């Protein structure tokens, strides 16, 4: 059966002016196709598009359906609805050209339909089928035209008709393609039909037709049609056509009067003719309308031919008299106003073409101009009379010739056709010439002789013949092909015969009537039998048809199943009867062969009896063979058949018993093997003879198969012969060519043997390795075991002429019928009778339908408008039909699996078998995030589940009917057979979903995006910690998940007071993050609306973040980290460190992981205060976990696909909180809860850094520290990435904002997210800094950085133009966030600190919010931001501080979020941006002077700050990852701080608390719970040295190594030649260097984590006292290269990119020549492990405080001497947060761990002392290179090394920001300011430390650096500091340490607490669990030069 025609109408609803026109065009088109192909052969569907940019809903029915009234009604209804929507909706804001929109619509249409699905129809379909809609169609009724099946081009069987207006003029074409200038066809082609789309069209065998719906009357007066002809040419190139709607509607003539007077009225050609020509294949079309040649000449008055040219003529109608004779056209004269239709003349129309004759072209052109027609005399060679013609010009090369048919000529035609002429007819033409009359008489007489005598014809025959005036009795034999239309059917003729037979009294004419009827009946029955494939009947069997018996009548009324069964039974009967026939009918075959015309050329065929003996026969056939080979024109197939027949006849004549066996032996005497043939023709060049012999050998063997079926019983022999045939055919192919072989097989072999030995032919094709032709495929029998057709056992009868395979008998009829019944029950719908292999095998051999991988953003596409816009270019997967499961014919060919969510939603629970075993048993453990508990039953499903191939009912029947199969080993997986492991792990049943807090809010059963394991663990860990924090609460959950294994102890040690609040907050928030795979039932967005209550932020309601409760705010799931693999996920639980390892492609970007980890830690270890801040942080983290929702909320703002939506900060409560803090001005300093209630405007940015929010128990300060986005800024997608987007609409800059994320809260409006890859920080906020961090820490932002080369994008130098404080800070935050996000951490992941770029971006942002940082990811340099000289962050800080103060009782420790008063006013200065140059361009942030004066802070705030600072800075958790507190501070102080870290890092930091050692000073003791991302850039107001000039860093080319990329990103942002300017704000608060603690967490065999707490960042302690050292800044010597320092020898192995957070942008961190900053924190070595006498951070003495090694030991040698412990958690910056860590005083002078680490820019004397390394050697030497950032002089002053210390001067909140945005700031901070530099270096160090997972500690024990949150938790943990002196006693030390270190929370500068408990190995934190490490230990990879 011919395949059906698939037609899709793609209707443009943009123009609804002429609705009726569009309807009529569509209807006439469908009507035409139905008439042409048959009503039952057309399947259609429709799609709508709006070329003006609006959206159209998909139709209710998305499948291809048969034509019917109901479908048309639905089409009209939906079309009207689309018009209505198009009229009401406003055009899209995106400026997409019409061509682009059409291209997208074509892509979707091609992907939505199954174009290649075969049409499965039962061969026993009843005569009438009543569809479900009541339409009755006759199955055997040929509804299509009598055109051959191949009339339609195979490609046109799949057609897309685009119904839209086509551009006509050049102007319209330019608007269509949105291009200007020259519109070449190629340009338009690239816009509309790019090569990718053309490939899809070609692969799916689809033709695209453009149906121009525009009214052509509108263009009649226009002379510019260049656009239209360009489109025509374009469509021709893709084998498409443009169809004018006028040709279909036929309205051209009616409206011709509207055309201009000079134009020629169009020809009224039937639209069917136009469509036939345009749609159907050219070769076949030419067969139907053959061209004929003609001669056109014009004779002058003098008789000379003035014009004589050859022309070609094509008929317009098939009714015309077609002839190949020559037509002569003689032009006679001209005429005007010719209207043939009005004249009522019958005409034949021909199209005349000539493109060569210039004279003719001139003539036609002249005729067109003068509106003239020419009269011509037309003469045909076979015409009796000449005719009159009218020539009408169409164009210069074409004209229309209308030949008038007069009545006389019509009469002549009738005479020819009718075949009977009466005397009256002759009289009628008596006036004709005698010669004509004689010819006519001759014709008539010949007709009379051939016709039967005039006899009465039966009435019914007269009626039939009367239907056509041209039919005569001679046509009756050709009646059958039209019988279906005329009504003469087999049954009808049989009934006539029976009726006539009943009459006994027959007259003479009645007898003739009866005889004619009998003949016709027999003829039709025979034809029907042959077509039905029932075989050839015996000659004497007159009546082969089946009488219309009552049984047969009854069958008509039976159900379809019974009809099929009975039909099959009858077929078996017929086959059984046929099998009794003699095998070949030699007599008939010989007679036929003898009758052939070629028989004369053959030697005389001897009779079998003429052979005297067998030898005579053999010699005869051999001679005959030689003659056949020599005769090239000899018919090889006929010869082979004759030979076999002769042999068998002889054997029969001698009475042989085994005729076939003996015949085979005789024939084999003629066989030659392929080897023999090669040898014989080795030297023979006669190719023809060789080919002839090969063909003879093939035909001999095939004929033997046919005439000697017994050989087919021997499978071995059969296989050998087939192999030999194959070898011979290969010789043919080699001798000629494969094309010759293909033709030989298809033309000569298939046509003769396809019906007799199809399987053998298939085997031959298979052996050749070529594709089996479709014709053969249709005939091949089913291979099913239950098939009734076992051809190998059946005796072959005569070859069947039908292609429909006949059913061969295989035993007794009863057995066959039983088999039939069984099969019918089993395969009710599988249509086994159809021999299509794909159908017949459905139940036996399970088809291995390839299950495509889950569509990346399939759900996003449905839920996110932005994503849809971005994905329009991609073909959308076909939507499986709802009823597909119930229909086998549908199900077999569904190429795409249904989405798991849909399947699960429909699947009964009883069938919802999970792919993981023991799910219930381990349900209690499911929320812990450990995927090890889930063990896949099968790693790979090799076969598609049965239920995907057959309907359930059919499957059950098959299982019952074939119990043997039910015992098969195939296990039926009732859910999608193949899923990524992460999907399986993430999936939870609805009940389990509710149980787990880690669940994300997602309506889908499966996570739309993979969720980071790290994030999961962090969240779960934080939850556990919170649960433990509750006073008196015992561990609720066992420490068995990786989170608990890694952080269990830490969590358990969380201070109880915060536990309840955090738990409550978490509950309220419904932590999305808890289950990476799952979203909590309540999506964060849902919670977000409630955020007013919790955090005071209506994040969800902010316009930016549309509230989509189902979309988890954490979109990370959707954002698949490209590198993340399912296998890694399996191992995640086993090795959490691996997850954190950036190098592992499977795992998410390390930054993300770190950030998450830190978040977990932050949540886990809130502060000792137990401030709600931690809780809020946890909430934030949780919310961050549900970035999807955030994304959804923000998706509106983001036009880019949801790459970074995961980071939607708006969603995350933390972001909201941050927003609150961002607008402290708006929010009173009252209790943070009040701020929370304030709403979007007063969003407190709950950033872990600033525990200000802590006081607000419900607002998750840290919840998504990295991502916290100012909820108030709904528009800014920056917030989307929790890390990055802190931007709140609140004008005031959120001091507390998540440092990493949106430092620039004000920037909230600008969607940071807009173009992740290319988003430019143009207007600081405008371009989402965070666009898509490659490694979004929390947000599962796509790992690919939005800024594709964020590293390269450098923030243009930021001028110090002041901008509104709020906005500036916001913008800074946003910029930082964007930078972070823009520079994916992976990109930064190379040693380049991720923050480097962000920090620079932040700097630039800080410098000027308005200035667009332009983070063009790759190379676009960030536009210069005008430095915000007075970026007043103070307002926000004050309010923040006030709010913090108000809450200080509960959140003193949490005041980290608060920015010191210094920061407030001078943050503006800090924000004054340095400049970030393009790739590796040096980022110089000059913060002229950022005096952090308490002036900006209200007295209350100051008090609060002092209290906070005095309270051990324990609450200070600097989110150093993305934006350290330095970033916040630097927002005010320097832009460099802003770039401290990428958003992801910031997210990692759970909280930062600022503890002022002295009442007047605010020291940040950063306990970073954040992820281990690099420490934020320290804000060093005290280092005025750098103020003067910006530290310059030389740009270097990027390294390919991943670990270089981070460094590279940082390097880009830094300008080495310019020393970092760090204006030291003259704030009273000292910048306390953040102490970074390296926490090595080893998993013990017991499953409990063993934590070794090590202080690593003492290196970059800076005296934050601005007043004391306001000008202290480290300047690099003029020629000093930041890379001239040696790397720490311990980092010999390069870290994997993900592990190392981007190092500071400082050139000191850069590796020379590697353009990437490779900052490794040697301090990250575990103190216990390091025995260096130089007070290396690895000091093992528990009682010894962790102090930076003496400055004399800062040398690289000392560093190199350290034990090779490469992992250090630099994120412990906020360890001071715990009051119990008093020992961290900076006074010790050396970082307990950072001894080998070069100092950061020395803001404080400590830094200077330590940075004594020549050239300001950066104390932190990562990997054998020492960075020389700090001038040696300054370094010497500071004994403690500073990697990148936060300026204590910066607010603790800023420090927190810096921590969070540490990575960002690192990127930004390079060279921007000394403090910035320090902070950046710290960040880099912190990043390195935390990312040190890449490093293998010298001990070879994988130690996981603990994230900031973890460190914070550790420091606060009572276990760690039991019996230790309170941190208050150590204020001085801490202040000293943090003066530089605070700002650099991540810097290992912090000395080891002298408190022995802190250092002692007894502390659970100090104990390293050898089994597991928090982060993967990586050996540093070698640098790639």
Curated annotation (Swiss-Prot):
Family the entry assigns: Belongs to the treslin family.
Compositional bias annotation for Basic residues: 823-837
GO cellular component labels: nucleus
GO molecular function: chromatin binding
Organism of provenance: Xenopus laevis (African clawed frog)
Sequence segments annotated as region (Disordered): 574-609, 791-858, 894-974, 999-1033, 1072-1156, 1184-1243, 1849-1875, 1938-1966
Ranges of biased composition (kind: Basic and acidic residues): 1144-1156, 1191-1200, 1225-1238
Name the UniProt record assigns to this protein: Treslin
Composition skew (Polar residues), residue ranges: 999-1026, 1085-1097, 1201-1224
Keywords (A to Z) from UniProt: Cell cycle, DNA damage, DNA repair, Nucleus, Phosphoprotein
């Amino acid at each position: 059966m011919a395949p059906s025609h698939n037609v899709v109408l793609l209707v443009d609803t943009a123009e609804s002016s002429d609705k009726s026109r569009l309807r009529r065009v569509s209807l006439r088109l469908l009507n035409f196709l139905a008439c042409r192909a048959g009503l039952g052969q057309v399947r259609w569907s429709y799609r709508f598009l709006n070329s003006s940019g609006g959206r159209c809903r998909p139709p209710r029915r998305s499948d291809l359906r048969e034509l019917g009234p109901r479908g048309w009604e639905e089409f009209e209804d939906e079309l009207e609805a689309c018009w209505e929507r198009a009229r009401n909706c406003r055009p899209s804001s995106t400026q997409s050209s019409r061509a682009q929109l059409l291209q997208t619509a074509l892509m979707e249409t091609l992907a939505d339909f199954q174009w290649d699905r075969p049409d499965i129809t039962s061969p026993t379909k009843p005569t009438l089928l009543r569809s479900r809609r009541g339409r009755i169609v006759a199955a055997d009724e040929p509804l299509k035209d009598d055109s051959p099946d191949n009339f339609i081009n195979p490609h046109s069987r799949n057609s897309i008709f685009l119904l839209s207006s086509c551009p006509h003029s050049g102007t319209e074409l330019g608007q269509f393609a949105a291009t200007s200038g020259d519109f070449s066809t190629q340009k338009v082609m690239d816009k509309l039909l790019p090569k990718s789309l053309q490939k899809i069209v070609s692969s799916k065998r689809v033709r695209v037709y453009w149906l121009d719906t525009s009214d052509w009357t509108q263009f009649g007066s226009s002379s510019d049609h260049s656009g239209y002809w360009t489109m025509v040419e374009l469509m021709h190139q893709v084998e498409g056509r443009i169809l004018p709607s006028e040709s279909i509607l036929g309205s051209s003539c009616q409206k011709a009067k509207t055309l201009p007077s000079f134009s020629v009225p169009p020809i009224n050609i039937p639209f069917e003719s136009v469509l036939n020509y345009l749609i159907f294949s050219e070769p076949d079309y030419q067969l139907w309308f053959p061209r004929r040649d003609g001669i056109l000449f014009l004779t002058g008055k003098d008789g000379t031919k003035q014009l004589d040219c050859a022309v070609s003529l094509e008929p317009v109608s098939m009714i015309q008299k077609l002839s190949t004779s020559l037509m002569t056209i003689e032009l006679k004269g001209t005429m005007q106003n010719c209207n043939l239709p009005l004249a009522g003349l019958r005409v034949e129309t021909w199209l005349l073409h000539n493109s060569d004759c210039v004279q003719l072209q001139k003539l036609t052109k002249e005729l067109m101009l003068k509106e003239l027609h020419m009269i011509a005399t037309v003469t045909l060679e076979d015409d009796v009379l000449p005719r009159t013609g009218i020539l009408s010009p169409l164009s210069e090369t074409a004209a229309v010739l209308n030949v008038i048919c007069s009545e006389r000529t019509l009469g002549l035609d009738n005479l020819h056709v009718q075949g009977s002429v009466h005397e009256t007819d002759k009289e009628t033409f008596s006036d004709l010439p005698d010669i004509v009359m004689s010819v006519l008489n001759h014709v008539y007489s010949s007709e009379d002789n051939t016709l039967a005598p005039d006899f009465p014809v039966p009435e019914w025959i007269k009626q039939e013949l009367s239907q056509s005036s041209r039919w005569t009795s001679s046509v009756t034999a050709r009646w059958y092909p039209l019988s279906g239309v005329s009504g003469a059917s087999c049954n009808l003729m049989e009934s006539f015969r029976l009726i006539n037979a009943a009459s006994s009294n027959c007259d003479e004419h009645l007898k003739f009537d009866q005889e004619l009827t009998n003949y016709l009946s027999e003829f039709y029955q025979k034809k029907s039998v042959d077509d039905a494939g029932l075989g050839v009947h015996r000659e004497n069997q007159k009546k082969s048809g089946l009488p219309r018996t009552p049984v047969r009548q009854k069958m008509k009324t039976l159900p379809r199943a019974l009809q099929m069964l009975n039909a099959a039974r009858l077929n078996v009967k017929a086959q059984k009867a046929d099998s009794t026939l003699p095998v070949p009918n030699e007599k008939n075959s010989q007679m036929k062969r003898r009758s052939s015309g070629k028989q004369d050329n053959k030697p005389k065929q001897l009779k079998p009896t003429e052979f005297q003996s067998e030898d005579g026969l053999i010699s005869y056939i051999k001679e005959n063979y030689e003659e056949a080979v020599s005769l090239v024109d000899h018919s090889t197939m006929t010869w082979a058949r004759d030979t076999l027949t002769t042999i068998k006849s002889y054997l029969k004549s001698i009475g042989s018993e085994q005729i076939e066996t003996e015949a085979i032996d005789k024939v084999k005497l003629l066989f030659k093997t392929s080897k023999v043939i090669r040898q014989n023709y080795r030297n023979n060049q006669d190719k023809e003879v060789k080919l002839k012999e090969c063909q003879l050998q093939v035909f001999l063997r095939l004929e033997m198969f046919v005439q000697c079926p017994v050989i087919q019983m021997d499978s071995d022999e059969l296989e050998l012969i087939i192999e030999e045939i194959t070898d011979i055919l290969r010789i043919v192919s080699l001798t000629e060519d494969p094309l010759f072989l293909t033709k030989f097989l298809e033309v000569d072999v298939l046509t003769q043997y396809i019906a007799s030995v199809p399987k053998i032919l298939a085997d031959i094709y298979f052996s050749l390795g070529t594709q089996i032709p479709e014709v053969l495929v249709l005939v091949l029998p089913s291979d099913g075991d239950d098939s009734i057709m076992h051809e190998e056992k059946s005796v072959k009868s005569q070859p069947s002429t039908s292609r429909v395979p006949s059913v061969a008998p295989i035993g007794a009829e009863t057995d066959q019928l039983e088999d039939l019944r069984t099969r019918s029950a089993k395969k009710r719908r599988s249509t086994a009778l159809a021999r299509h292999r794909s159908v017949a095998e459905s139940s036996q051999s399970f088809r291995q339908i390839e299950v495509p991988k889950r569509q990346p953003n399939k759900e996003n596409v449905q839920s996110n408008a932005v994503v849809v816009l971005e994905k329009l270019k991609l073909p959308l997967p076909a939507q499986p039909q709802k009823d597909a499961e119930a229909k086998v014919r549908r199900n077999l060919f569904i190429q795409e699996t249904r989405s798991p969510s849909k399947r699960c939603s429909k699947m009964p629970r009883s069938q919802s078998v999970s792919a993981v075993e023991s799910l219930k048993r381990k349900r209690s453990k499911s929320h812990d995030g450990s995927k090890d508990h889930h063990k896949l039953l099968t790693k790979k499903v090799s076969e598609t589940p049965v239920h995907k191939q057959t309907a359930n009912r059919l499957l059950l029947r098959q299982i019952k009917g074939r119990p043997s199969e039910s015992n098969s080993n195939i296990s039926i997986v009732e859910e999608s057979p193949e899923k990524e492991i992460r999907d399986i792990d993430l999936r939870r049943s609805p009940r389990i979903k509710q149980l787990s807090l880690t669940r994300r809010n997602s309506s889908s059963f499966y996570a739309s995006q993979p969720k980071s394991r790290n994030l999961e663990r962090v969240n779960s860990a934080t939850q556990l910690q919170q649960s433990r924090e509750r006073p008196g609460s015992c561990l609720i959950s066992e420490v068995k998940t990786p989170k608990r294994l890694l952080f269990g102890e830490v969590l358990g040690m969380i201070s109880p007071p915060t536990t309840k609040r955090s738990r409550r907050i978490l509950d309220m928030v419904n932590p999305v993050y808890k289950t990476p795979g799952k979203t909590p039932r309540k999506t964060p967005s849902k919670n977000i609306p409630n955020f007013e209550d919790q955090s005071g932020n209506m994040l969800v309601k902010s316009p930016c973040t549309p509230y989509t409760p189902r979309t988890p705010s954490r979109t990370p799931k959707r954002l698949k980290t490209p590198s993340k693999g399912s296998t890694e996920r399996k191992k995640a639980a086993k090795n959490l460190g691996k997850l954190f390892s950036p190098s592992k492609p499977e795992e998410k970007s390390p930054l993300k992981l770190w950030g998450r980890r830190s978040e977990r830690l932050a949540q886990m270890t809130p502060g000792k205060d137990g401030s709600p801040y931690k809780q809020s942080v946890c909430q934030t983290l949780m919310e961050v976990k549900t970035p999807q929702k955030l994304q959804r909320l923000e998706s509106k703002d983001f036009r880019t696909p949801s790459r970074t939506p995961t980071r939607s900060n708006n969603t995350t409560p933390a972001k909201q909180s941050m927003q609150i803090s961002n607008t402290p001005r708006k929010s009173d300093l009252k209790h943070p809860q009040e701020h929370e209630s304030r709403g979007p405007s007063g969003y407190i940015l709950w950033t872990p850094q600033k525990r200000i929010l802590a006081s607000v128990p419900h607002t998750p300060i840290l919840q998504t520290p990295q991502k916290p986005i100012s909820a108030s800024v709904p528009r800014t997608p920056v917030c989307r990435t929790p890390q990055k987007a802190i931007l709140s609409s609140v004008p005031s800059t959120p001091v507390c904002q998540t440092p990493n994320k949106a430092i620039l809260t004000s920037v909230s409006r600008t969607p940071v997210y807009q173009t992740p890859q290319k988003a430019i920080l143009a207007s600081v906020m405008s371009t989402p800094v965070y666009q898509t961090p490659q490694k979004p820490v929390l947000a599962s932002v796509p790992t690919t950085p939005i800024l594709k080369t964020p590293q390269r994008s450098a923030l243009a130098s930021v001028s110090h133009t002041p901008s509104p404080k709020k906005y500036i800070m916001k913008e800074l935050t946003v910029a930082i966030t964007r930078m972070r996000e823009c520079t994916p951490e992976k990109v930064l992941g190379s040693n380049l600190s991720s923050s480097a770029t962000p920090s620079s971006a932040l700097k630039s942002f800080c410098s000027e919010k308005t200035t667009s940082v332009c983070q063009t990811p790759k190379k676009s340099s960030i536009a210069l931001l005008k430095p915000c000289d007075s970026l007043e962050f103070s307002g926000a800080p004050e309010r923040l501080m006030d709010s913090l103060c108000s809450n200080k009782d509960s959140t003193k420790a949490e005041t980290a979020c608060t920015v010191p008063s210094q920061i407030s006013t001078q943050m503006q200065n800090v924000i004054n941006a340095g400049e970030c140059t393009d790739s590796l361009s040096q980022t110089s942030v000059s913060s002229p002077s950022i005096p952090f004066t308490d002036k900006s802070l209200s007295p209350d705030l100051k008090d609060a700050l002092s209290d906070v600072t005095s309270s051990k800075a324990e609450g200070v958790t600097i989110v150093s990852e993305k934006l350290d507190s330095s970033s916040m501070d630097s927002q005010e102080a320097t832009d460099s701080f802003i770039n401290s870290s990428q958003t992801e890092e910031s997210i990692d930091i759970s909280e930062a608390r600022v503890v002022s050692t002295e009442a007047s000073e605010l020291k940040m003791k950063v306990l970073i719970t954040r992820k281990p991302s690099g420490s934020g850039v320290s804000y060093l107001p005290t280092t005025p040295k750098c103020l003067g000039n910006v530290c310059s860093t030389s740009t270097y080319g990027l390294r390919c190594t991943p670990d270089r990329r981070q460094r590279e990103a940082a390097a880009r942002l830094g300008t080495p030649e310019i020393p970092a300017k760090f204006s030291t704000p003259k704030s009273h608060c000292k910048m306390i260097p953040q102490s970074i603690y390296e926490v090595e967490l080893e998993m013990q065999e017991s499953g409990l984590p063993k934590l070794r707490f090590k202080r690593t960042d003492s290196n970059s302690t800076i005296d934050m006292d601005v007043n004391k050292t306001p000008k202290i800044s480290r300047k690099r010597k003029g020629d000093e290269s930041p890379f001239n320092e040696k790397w720490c020898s311990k980092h010999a192995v390069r870290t994997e990119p993900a592990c190392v957070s981007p190092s500071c942008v400082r050139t000191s961190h850069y590796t020379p020549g590697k353009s990437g900053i490779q900052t490794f924190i040697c301090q990250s070595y575990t103190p216990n492990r390091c025995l260096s006498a130089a007070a290396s951070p690895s000091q093992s003495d528990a009682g010894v405080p962790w102090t930076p090694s003496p400055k004399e030991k800062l040398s690289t040698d000392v560093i190199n001497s350290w034990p090779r412990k490469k992992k250090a958690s630099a994120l412990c910056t906020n360890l001071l947060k715990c009051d119990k860590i008093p020992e961290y005083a900076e006074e010790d002078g050396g970082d307990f761990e950072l001894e080998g680490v070069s100092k950061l820019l020395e803001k404080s004397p400590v830094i200077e002392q330590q940075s004594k390394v020549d050239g300001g050697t950066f104390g932190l030497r990562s990997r054998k290179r020492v960075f020389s950032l700090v001038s040696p002089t300054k370094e010497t002053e500071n004994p403690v090394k500073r990697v990148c210390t936060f300026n204590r001067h910066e607010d603790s909140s800023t420090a927190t920001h810096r921590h969070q945005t540490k990575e960002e700031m690192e990127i930004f901070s390079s060279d921007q300011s000394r403090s910035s530099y320090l902070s950046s270096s710290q960040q880099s160090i912190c990043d390195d430390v935390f990312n040190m997972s890449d490093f293998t500690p010298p001990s070879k024990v994988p130690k996981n650096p603990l994230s900031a949150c973890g460190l914070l938790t550790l420091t606060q943990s009572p276990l760690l500091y039991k019996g230790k002196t309170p941190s208050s006693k150590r204020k001085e030390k801490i202040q000293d340490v943090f003066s530089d270190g605070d700002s650099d929370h991540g810097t290992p500068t912090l000395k080891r607490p002298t408190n022995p408990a802190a250092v002692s190995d007894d502390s659970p934190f100090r104990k390293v669990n050898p089994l597991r490490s928090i982060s993967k230990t990586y050996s540093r990879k070698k640098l790639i030069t």
